[in-house]
């Protein structure tokens, strides 16, 4: 199952995340959920000392930050590359 933070929904409603980009990420997460193969996409583990293992998924200039818990995907931030890493921490 894919879970999105409320902040992502707010950003989408404000127009900060284009519908096309949100659809690209959602389709990628659906494919990940079905295949469980992270090598199909441009996904990298985020380095650092965090409580969880965070990953980033890249689609053009946009990034999605997420973690996996019991085969569920929790997307915590979607944004442009320049700002995404500063805002989610």
Locate predicted features:
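Arg/Lys-rich, positively charged N-terminal/basic patches that mediate binding to nucleic acids
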Residues: 1-29
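A residue-level signal for beta-strand positions that form part of recognition/binding surfaces
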Residues: 1, 54, 72
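General structural signal for secondary-structure boundaries
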Residues: 21-22, 36-37, 67, 80
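A short, surface-exposed loop/turn module that caps and links secondary-structure elements
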Residues: 30-56
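Enriched for short, Lys/Arg-rich terminal
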Residues: 6-7, 13, 59-63, 67-89
């Amino acid at each position: 199952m894919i879970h999105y933070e409320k902040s992502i929904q707010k950003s989408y409603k404000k127009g900060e995340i284009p519908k096309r980009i949100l659809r690209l990420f959602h389709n990628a997460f659906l494919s990940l959920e079905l295949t469980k193969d992270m090598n199909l996409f441009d996904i990298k583990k985020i380095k650092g000392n965090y409580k969880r293992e965070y990953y980033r998924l890249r689609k053009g200039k946009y990034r999605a930050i997420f973690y996996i818990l019991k085969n569920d995907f929790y997307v915590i931030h979607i944004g442009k590359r320049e700002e995404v890493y500063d805002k989610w921490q």
